[in-house]
Amino acid sequence: MGLSFQHILILLVVVLLLFGRNKISDLMGDFAKGIKAFKKGMSDDEVETAKSDSIKTIDNTGKPTNVQANPQRQDSTV
């Protein structure tokens, strides 16, 4: 048993009576500002990611170096 059109209409009337028309419009305006701020933050993050990806390039034209991970130590005491 789900919500019918009559149930939804009654809920809307009760919400309008409880909050009033001005309060609901203020809430919807705040909700819209939140969505805009979220979208702006997501687009700013994508721009920063694109900038950081272009900066992190490695030029592999140098000579390779041989590095020994665990060099053996030579003890001078016998």
Curated annotation (Swiss-Prot):
Protein's membrane topology: Single-pass membrane protein
GO molecular function: protein transmembrane transporter activity
Transmembrane feature ranges: 4-21
Biological processes, Gene Ontology terms: protein transport by the Tat complex
Pfam family, one: TatA_B_E
Biased composition (Polar residues): 57-78
InterPro entries assigned: TatA/B/E (IPR003369), TatA/E (IPR006312)
GO cellular component: TAT protein transport complex
Membrane keyword on record: yes
Keyword Amino-acid biosynthesis: no
HAMAP family attached to this UniProt entry: TatA_E (MF_00236)
Family: Belongs to the TatA/E family.
Protein's recorded name: Sec-independent protein translocase protein TatA
Taxonomic path: Bacteria, Pseudomonadati, Pseudomonadota, Alphaproteobacteria, Hyphomicrobiales
